[in-house]
Structure formats: structure tokens, C-alpha cells
Amino acid sequence: MPYRTLFVALLWWAFAPLPAQNTLNVDLLGQYNPGDGRASGSWSYVGADGREYALLGAQTGTAILEIGTGGDLAERAFIPGPPSNWREITVVGDHAYVVTEGSGSPHPGMQVIDLSNLPQSAALSTTFNTAFNRGHIIQKAIFEDQPYVYVCGTTTTSGVHIIDVSDPANPQQVGLYQPGYYIHDCHVRGNILFAAAFYEGTMDILDISDPANPVLLNRMSYPGGNTHSMSTTLDMDYLFLCDEQDGLIARMYDITDLTEPVQVATYTANLQSLVHNPYIRGDFMFITHNTEGLRVLDITDPAVPVEVGYFDTYAGQSGGFSGLWSACPYLPSGKILGGNREDGLYVWAFNNTKAGRYYGQVIDSLSGAPIVNAVVTLADNPGLAQTTDFDGAFNGGSLSDAVTLTVERSGYESKTVEVSLQSGTGTNITVALRPIATATTMPLEDQTVLLYPTPAQQSVQVNLPDLPKGTTAILLSMEGQPVQSWQELNTNLLLIERGHTPAGKYLFVLYSPTGQVLTTQPVVFQ
């Protein structure tokens, strides 16, 4: 089922970085380069004594490092594996589980590494290769305790293998999602599995209450491609979805109804570089953004994500498959790990800075009607703009104490306002635009435009007063998309035919010849 879209704008309002800076609110504590080629996946482990460890997918194996209080790193073990540019890791209990696309004899499958003897040693416990030879990604349920790991993109099925690791020395496959196309990555919350169907450009949502019998709830299509990875907020009301292709934005969805996700926001730090992997911890999301490094978003309001920190790990040009591959922000100390392709493991600290947000509405100063498609420009980013939705709404956020906004709409005088902001809170504002007065374009009283019946089955009749030449009308969907339009209205009676228009709520908007909103009224088809 396709998703629905609410008003969305690129996250251009999040920040205005200085060109010379490569970090904001993120401090580098430690770094480790295995020196054997490209690095990739990373994960964390905490021993019974509270010591913290980082695990890094290196070119020739898995590096295991103890993290000191200040972020200093000491290698405690290195578990060899088939050479590969891609090595992914997760940890369940006292064991790490590692997959790679590297080949070897015997077939590598999934390595199981016993971490319980750290810091003295770590050892390969077993290799599970009865269900697959190689795998691209391995995941677990990050926010719940489950005895399962999930392996995606395998050479045998290209699907998702559900492996019971309650006995780490004897893993057992207990489920398989094999849709007949390639699943690149997945994310698990409770009994729900989200699967990235890379080449299909869809996200599959499954009920895995019975791991042996995954049930497809929804196959969500959207205007992206190369569906790559995703993560959910702690309350599981929102999901952040990334595409592995330069030039594509990442998207935030309201998933309170899994059968009909609603897109509520988008994000990119730089369209030239793809958004690779998201990791959510509390009110923050930590994103690996390839050549743009680590990016931190404040998602206190997931529908208005605001960038509040970053650390650039790549000195070259933006774009392509370089820079930061993975991150892991789940250590009790709050330290953040990252696997950078060129030079290995990074350890960071983020200072938990939050943004201030604004929630605005643009209205007609005379009629009070919301103004659709008004253009809102942030002074710090004059080349980019946000457009109001069918409610005249717009929103944004910033680390600054105040932002200056300019609001414009044809048929109205433009207006510039300064909005004071406070970290961690939201400010509501109303911007009233004054119509450019002419003898024939004053707003209409709502009672002079009558629509009936509504709700309607097949058609709605609109009774209109005498209108100036050049008056136009449009029927908008609740997503702000045009459904029908009428040009040069010269009649007092207009019929809105339903035709193939789906049942639902719509908005009838009447415009003056200069683009001023004369009236806005709801239309409902049953």
C-alpha cells in the first residue's frame, strides 16, 4: 500500500554551519585504525564489571577494543575473518555475531564470538553456515531483549533469516522471510519487522509473532529508491527511512497505523551525499551520512527533526561511498562509536544540545483564512524556502536564540518576522498577510459561498456570488495536492464532480485574479 504524505520540507532550517568547521557539539575522544584496509560495521559491548568495549568490522576480521573512561582505546582481541569491505556486527548477551560478504573455505556464514572473558581474551565460539554462506547485514531488536538475530541479504535466499541464539554455541534458524527479492537490511521492534527491499524501492512491514510464519502487513511504496535502512522512535510512533543513493532525501513517517504510514518530514545535510544508517537514542538520532560524517538530529518532535550536531570524518568531496559507514550510540556512558571506511573506529561524546522550534500559520489578515502555498524563507538560508500546506502551516527549528523569517504570497504584501526560540521548547506564531487591495479582490464572507451536499456521494454544488474576471478555484487533497481546478470562473454555479476521486476530505479554495485567497471551505466525499 502506498503511503500518504503530509506537508514536508527539507530540513534546511536546522543549522547554518561555518565553512571552516568540521564539528558541532560533538567531541572526538579516541580513534583506532586497524591498518588493514577499509572499516565498516561497529557495535558495543558492556562486560559484567561495567567495562565498555567497541567492536569494529575491519577488512580482515573483527577488532575488539576496550574503551577507557576518557575514550582512549586498547585492542583486546582480533578475530580473523574472510577479507571483505563489509563486515557487520551485533551483540546479544555475552556474544558477538558477525556476518560478511567475504568468501572463504569453509563458508564463513555467521561467526559467533565469545566476549565473556574480556578484557583478558575473546574467542571464536562457532561458525553458523547451515542456512547461508554470506550475509550483508545482521541486526537484533535494539530496544527489547530477544534471543534472536536477523541476517539480511544472504547468498542463499536474499531474504531475512531469523536465528535463535539463546544457545550461542548452537544457533538455530527458526524463521525465514523470503519474498523472492533482495532484502538489504531490517529493523525489529517487538513482533514487527521492517525490511528494506533495496531494488524494489519498498519497505515491507511484517508481523513476526510466529517467527516460523512471518506475515506481510504492508508493502510500502514511496517516491525514493534503493531502500536501505530504517529506525523507529522509542514509542514506535515514527520511523526514519534512508535510501542508499546520492541525491535522495531521508524520510520520517508516522507509523501509528502500520497499514498506512504518513510522511511527516524529510532530512538531508547535503543532497550530494546519501544518508546511510540511522540510530535512535532517546530524543536524538545519530546518522551516518557517508562523506558528511556523523550527524545528530534532535527528534524531540519527530515531525520536526532539527540537526544539532555533527562531526565530519571525510576530507574529500561530497558524494559516493566514502566516509562514515556505521555508528552505535548505545553505551551506558553515552559514548558514540563509528566505523569510518578510510581510517577505522571513532569514539565521540555529544553534549545533548537541543534545538528550539517554531510552529507557524500564515493567514489572510482580513478573512482569517489560511493561506496555502505561501513561501517562508529563513534569513540564514535565503536560497531555500518552505511552502505552507493547506492549513497555512509551516514549522522549523534552530540552535539560534532567534530566527528571521520572510513570508511571501502572490496577491499579498510580504512580511518579515523575528521569532525568539528557546532550547527544547516550541514557539507558536501566526503571520497575517495583508492582501494587496484592489477594487475587485476583497475576501468573500464564507456565507456568500455555499457548498452542498457535504458529505457527498457523487458531486457537490457550489453557489457563488458575482466574481471578478480571472477568478480561479482549486480542489486540494488533504496532502495539499491539486485534484481539480477551474480557470476563469464566470458562473454563479459550479459543480464539483467526484469522478475517480477517492473518498475522503478535501479543500475548496477560491482565488482572486491576483492570487489572493477569497475563501477556503471543506469538501467531503463518502
How would you name each of these model-derived features?
Residues F394, T427-I429, N492-I496:
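Short strand-edge motifs at loop-to-beta-strand transitions and within beta-strands
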Residues M1-T23, T440:
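Bacterial Sec-dependent N-terminal signal peptides
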Residues S367-V372, L378-S398, V419, E488:
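Short, acidic Ser/Thr/Gly-rich low-complexity loop/linker segments typical of extracellular
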Residues E418-T425, A432-R434, P522-Q526:
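Short beta-strand edge segments in extracellular beta-sheet folds
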Residues A20-L366, Q386:
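Feature marking well-ordered beta-strand scaffolds used for ligand recognition
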Residues V372-T377, L399, T404-T416, P443-Y452, ...:
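C-terminal outer-membrane/trafficking sorting elements
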Residues W348-A369, I429-Y452:
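Residue-level detector of functionally pivotal "anchor" positions at catalytic/ligand-binding pockets or at interdomain
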